[in-house]
Amino acid sequence: MINVAQLTRLPRKFGKYYDRQFLPLLEKTGLSMREIHVLLFLANHPGQDTARDVTELRGIAKSQVSQAVETLTGRGLLSRRADGEDRRIIHLEITEQGAPLAREAQAVQAACGGRLLAGLTEEEQTVFLELLERVLRRTEELSMEKECQP
């Protein structure tokens, strides 16, 4: 039988560990974790480069994404570009100035994943990540339901 308490504890524990790994970068840059999340999302998801993409796929509130984008563009780390076909759509691009910071954040992110899975063999890591992806997909499906059903 599955221990649901463990499942609900994992995201909180990992989230705290993950965010803590970024503290030196946050102190160095003066950015918030949310701003780093937006920068990382754009770096890790080429082609998914609108504020709406960040909101929907990363699960950050629209107002928070908007505020983060304002800060990042104000610091010259992101730029905005209107879509060629629909000028209402604004694409976000990491600037030349923002690229080194995005790479540094990606390195921290990769190190977090590496440390987390370090106790597993390569085969176990593959199986774990495949199972995790299936659970995430199922979670997405269930999140659309109105209430929990047995």
Q: Predicted regions span which residues?
A:
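Charged, amphipathic alpha-helical coiled-coil/dimerization segments
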Residues: 19, 70-133
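C-terminal regulatory/oligomerization modules of transcriptional regulators
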Residues: 1, 123-150
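N-terminal helix-turn-helix DNA-binding core of bacterial DNA-binding proteins
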Residues: 20-64, 147-148
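N-terminal positioning helix adjacent to the helix-turn-helix/winged-helix DNA-binding module
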Residues: 3, 34, 50, 97, ...
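Surface-exposed, interaction-prone regions with an acidic/low-complexity signature
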Residues: 1-9, 62-65, 147-149
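N-terminal leader segment of winged-helix/HTH proteins
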Residues: 1-29, 75-77
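Short, locally clustered residues in the helix-turn-helix/winged-helix DNA-binding domain
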Residues: 15, 40-46, 106, 133
